[in-house]
Curated annotation (Swiss-Prot):
Subunit structure: Homodimer. The tRNA molecule binds across the dimer.
Pathway: Aminoacyl-tRNA biosynthesis; selenocysteinyl-tRNA(Sec) biosynthesis; L-seryl-tRNA(Sec) from L-serine and tRNA(Sec): step 1/1
Name of the encoding gene: serS
Keywords: Aminoacyl-tRNA synthetase, ATP-binding, Cytoplasm, Ligase, Nucleotide-binding, Protein biosynthesis
Predominant subcellular localization, coarse grouping: cytoplasm
The name this protein goes by in its record: Serine--tRNA ligase
Species this chain originates from: Rhizorhabdus wittichii (strain DSM 6014 / CCUG 31198 / JCM 15750 / NBRC 105917 / EY 4224 / RW1) (Sphingomonas wittichii)
Compartments (UniProt record): Cytoplasm
UniProt-annotated binding residues for ATP: 260-262, 347-350
Pfam families: Seryl_tRNA_N (PF02403), tRNA-synt_2b (PF00587)
Length: 425
């Protein structure tokens, strides 16, 4: 959500910023609604004031036996009482239209975000690790993980496409990955949370998935939404809250199932675990002040990178361009892991600084130190630390052996009960 006051102050700058996101000029439409809203509010306030004055004057006129004046004032009060509900209704309608228009516009990009249309225009920041060299032709995980316990056919029979059943060693490996990630992130200062998986409209609106991306979500018959990411539940913990500056930054992590319809991804990544309707992810969320925001963003990104490095998985960090960023983000770093079977880097984490965009939608504020009354909107940040299923894919492909077995990364062996290798059944 955007601050209409800032748009009033510099409409040209606002239009220039959203143009970088590929959005059409909006300031004229927004300011017209804002002007009408304020005019109605002014007229309503004047009507209320005049009604009170006239009501008081009626008593005075009657006390003076001036029935003509009293009658005229009574007629005026009656007209005002009839007019005011119409003004209130019109004001509510205009305000709703303004709020809806503001809610449909993406966040403004930070100054250092590169302009661009899509992922081809993203800016690589750095790389870590060297892609493994195999003495055999590397395969995609879907081509060799079946004998390890990965079963797409059984899942399809139960649930349809884009689901998987994991059994035996590969199921244990996924569980180990999630536990390993949680342990690392809590050691990095994130508080573990077990949040709800079903949320209300207000929660999904607050983090920006509604109303624009409803088709990408699953909704229950009673009107709740399955979370597409724990970002929704964690970030909404501060909705309608005022926290003390001393409590910031608040850093939270959660391992949850996530659910996405992938309506906009038809035909993409139809094989394997890369794009599923149901998957597990360790989410990182931070609530902080504007002054700390950039530093927290960097620290969160490094916390995600540390998982990849501990697992020995080659990756690169890219700064997303304006055309590839998510709706709520003002700046996003993607971490892309090397997948030998595909011969390319694929996204495994996206860490975003949303500024006060989500906070305005949620009315999430903090009270600066030393102030007893004033409040400011918090900044919210979120990222994957990491996507468990995609990390499983990366481990399978980077540690695959010619005989179809998979070596367990050293850091995971304790989480596997000492098992150092997965072998085909």
């Amino acid at each position: 959500m955007h601050d209409i006051r800032l748009i009033r102050e510099d409409p040209a700058a606002f239009d220039a910023a959203i143009a970088r996101r590929g959005a059409e000029s909006a300031s004229s439409r927004l300011l017209a609604l804002d002007e009408r809203r304020r005019a109605i509010a002014t007229e309503l306030q004047a009507a209320q004031t005049r009604r009170n004055e006239a009501s008081k004057a009626i008593g005075q006129a009657k006390a003076q036996k001036d029935e003509a004046t009293a009658s005229a004032l009574m007629a005026e009060v009656a007209a005002l009482k009839e007019r005011m509900p119409a003004l209130e209704a019109e004001g509510a309608e205009v305000e709703a239209a303004l709020d809806a228009a503001l809610a449909a516009i993406p966040n403004l990009p930070a100054a250092d975000v590169p302009d661009g249309a899509d992922e081809q225009d993203n800016a690589e920041q750095h790389r870590w690790g060297t892609p493994p060299a195999f003495a055999f032709e590397a395969r995609e995980h879907a081509d060799f993980a079946g004998p390890l316990g990965l079963d797409f056919e059984a899942a399809a029979a139960i649930s349809g496409a884009r689901f998987a059943v994991l059994k035996g060693g590969i199921a244990r490996l996924q569980r180990a990955l999630g536990a390993f990630m949680l342990d690392r992130q809590t050691a990095a200062g994130f508080t573990e949370v077990i949040p709800p998986l079903l949320v209300r409209d207000e929660a999904v609106f607050g983090t920006g998935q509604l109303p624009k991306f409803a088709e990408d979500l699953f909704r229950t018959t009673d009107g709740r939404w399955l979370i597409p990411t724990a970002e929704v539940s964690l970030t909404n913990l501060v909705r309608e809250q005022i926290v003390a500056e001393a409590e910031l930054p608040m850093k939270m992590t959660a391992l949850t199932p996530c659910f996405r319809s992938e309506a906009g991804a038809a035909g993409r990544d139809t094989r394997g675990l890369i794009r599923q309707h149901q998957f597990e992810k360790v989410e990182l969320v931070a609530i902080t002040t504007p002054e700390q925001s950039d530093a927290v963003h960097e620290a969160m990104t490094k916390a995600a990178e540390a998982i990849l490095e501990a697992l020995g998985l080659p990756y690169r960090r890219v700064l997303l361009c304006t055309g590839d960023m998510g709706f709520t983000a003002r700046k996003t770093f993607d971490l892309e892991v090397w997948l030998p079977g595909q011969g390319c880097y694929r996204e495994i984490s996206s860490v975003s600084n949303c500024g006060d965009f989500q906070a305005r939608r949620m009315n999430a504020r903090y009270r600066p130190a030393g102030e007893s009354k004033g409040t400011r909107f918090v900044h919210t940040l979120n990222g994957s630390g990491l996507a468990v299923g995609r990390t499983l894919v990366a481990v399978l492909e980077n540690y695959q052996q010619a005989d179809g077995s998979v070596t367990i990364p050293e850091a995971l062996v304790p989480y596997m009960g000492g098992i150092a290798e997965l072998r085909p059944a």
